[in-house]
Amino acid sequence: MARSVLAPAVLALLATPALAEGEVDLRVMSFNIWYGGVQVSQPQLIEVIRASGADIVGLQEPDGQTAAIAAAAGYPYVDLRRHIISRVPLFDPKQGERTDKGQAPYPLAGLDADAPHVWAMVAPGHVIALGNLHLSSDPYGPDLLRDGSGTDEVVAAETKVRLAEIEPYAAGMEPLVARGVPVIVTGDFNSPSHLDWTEAAKGSRPQQSVALPWPVTQRMEAAGFADAFRAAHPDLVARPGISYSPGFPWPLQVEGESMDRIDYIFAANATVRGAELWGEPGNPDVDRGFAPWPSDHRAVIADLTVTPAPAPALLAVEPRLVPEGGTFLVRGYLPGDAVWGVRIVPRGGDAASQTVTSVEGLTPTWNRAFRLSTLGLTPGPWDAVLIDETGEEQARTRFSVIGRDGKPVLSPASSSVKTGDPVTVSWTGAPGLKYDWIGVFAAGDPNVYNYLAFAYTGAVLDGTMTLTPDLYYDTLAPGDYVLRLMADDHYAVLAETPFTVTE
């Protein structure tokens, strides 16, 4: 049975043809919210998101605010590892945190290379795949052109930085695209589009004086994705779609700042029905204006039609970090209207022999959910295991119970290391946000921007990492230092612990 998901703005498109069997209409938003949405007004930011009527929103630069923004804007489902908020249920395709070893390219921080997506159940038993990313901003191609670099130099810089970042991400999505699964990727790519910088459009803006084959958007196109805004607005001159920047904040502009379309919604195996640019009032390229505009980026919105794919076995625990004495929500799905259940086991434990608590024999119902207590679950790492009616494991996801004080703990493997040696550190109770990180600071320096080395935690709640010498800006001289657990690519200190470097 065809159905439309939630968004009144989509339902109001009276000119849209009737949906074919199995098709679903979706409204999607991509929004760089500028350091958590607090630089102008977070309430105004939330109002913009509410007004969009989007079913799914990909946020960039949320700085630990994703869950709070979702709650305030009325979005019940949140993916903290991808910074996606949704009106439809979200399920991680693997275990809920990064299991790959080592540091990942920036857009894959907190994610496994073979699972950059999250499943969104847009119809009973049927899903699409979602991704959301933010590519590195420096060196910025339009700035290089402005400052005199040639096109070959710019393409070389793009290839070295952003193409290197998008390559493994696109490669991780390509198998889904090849299977015919609808895949939607939102993001701030920090790169203009090869579809915009053409010979025909050369000179249409003062800052666009050359034609240039921007490689990042070419790579997304090669992976099977369509640029939703340009598909809806092929006239480059009439609708340039400049997403950066309306101001810092609007209406303040920085003289000489390079403006371009760098925020995108890419869609594969989907039909683009329309796209909009939201931003400041009075701009003829903006479809809807708000005063004040709450970000240094404009927002991109796309109306899409998809035919979702049959869902695999799915399991989610919310929240992933559960206070001792609290409760957590478990959501599950088994294909084929199968009876299902969930068993809670210690991390990596056997569901047949190590179950601490369980709920089993559930009647199949779409998005069936139940609450469990942490009674009997000591602080530490746990797994929820999805089972069928025979008790066979079908899926598994990770969560952790944190002590009653709710505070993360950071512990070095040794309180003293020699100059040039790696530093190993463990942590428990991290929030599991995409860009949580651990930094090294000089003891006594209160400036949290002065980190001497850093590495992302992989969005792991309880884990261990080794800060190897290649991660340091300079070799640490003998002296006293501090390790700090920091939140989501920002500077809120969650935990810290001292260590000493000796000769």
Per-region residue spans from a language model:
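N-terminal, active-site-proximal structural segment of metallo-dependent hydrolase catalytic domains
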Residues: 3-6, 10, 19-72, 127-128, ...
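N-terminal signal peptide c-region/cleavage motif recognized by signal peptidases
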Residues: 15-17
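Metal-dependent phosphoester-hydrolase catalytic domains
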Residues: 21, 175-182, 191-313
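Active-site-proximal beta-strand elements of phosphoester/diester hydrolases
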Residues: 25-35, 127-156, 297
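Structured beta-strand-rich core segments of catalytic domains in phosphoester-bond hydrolases
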Residues: 56, 60-144, 276-279
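Surface-exposed cleft-lining segments at the edges of enzyme active sites
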Residues: 103-106, 145-163, 202-205
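His/acidic metal-ligating clusters that form di-metal
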Residues: 129, 158-189
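Extended, solvent-exposed regions of the mature portions of secreted/cell-surface glycoproteins
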Residues: 312-503
